[in-house]
Amino acid sequence: MNFRYPIFLDLSGKKCLVIGEGHEIAGKVQGLVDAEARVSYVNPRAEPAIQALAAAGQVSWERRNFAELDLDGCFLAIVDCADNAEIFRLAEERQVLVNAADDPKHCRFSFGSVHRQGDLTVAISTNGVAPALAVESKVACRYSSAKKWPPQPPPLT
């Protein structure tokens, strides 16, 4: 695998499409909502967490299968379905950043193991070579940062 360029994206107001179902997809949807993206979720079924986000107006849920027009105006797409290859091709034509879960050849970006604590965000990646090591490193970071974050102002003298 080639070198992946680490980047933190400002997704506020950007249309992001999510296709698929399951616990991991629900986590991705929540992460996009937390990043203030405009989330469009396309799938006949949804996890309870996604249903709640849709009911609260934080996610637009289309209760159907993917259609090519769903990619129009998208900045980013996350997919986990039988059509990963086709959706990747269509996304590439539109210059949409795409991630197909557990399908590296159909990804333009990947998710690292992420630790968030207030304004501190640490993302760790092994380019898919050792995911367990990335998780272990995230856990170590969590324990280390718990003592040091947030930074304390110097004492007043």
Which role fits each region the language model picked out?
Residues G27, A35-L53:
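NAD(P)-binding Rossmann-fold cofactor-contacting core
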Residues Q58-S60:
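Short, conserved active-site loop motifs that form the nucleotide-linked donor/cofactor pocket
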Residues I7-V29, P155-T157:
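Glycine-rich adenosine-cofactor-binding loop
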Residues M1-L11, F111-G112:
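A short, basic/flexible loop-to-alpha-helix module at the beginning of a structural domain
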Residues E36-S40, C74-A82, L120-V129:
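Short beta-strand and adjoining strand-loop segment in the mid-core
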Residues G128-T157:
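An accessory alpha-helical subdomain
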Residues R63-E68:
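Conserved SAM/SAH-binding loop
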Residues L76-D80, A85-F111:
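ADP-ribose/adenylate-binding Rossmann-like module
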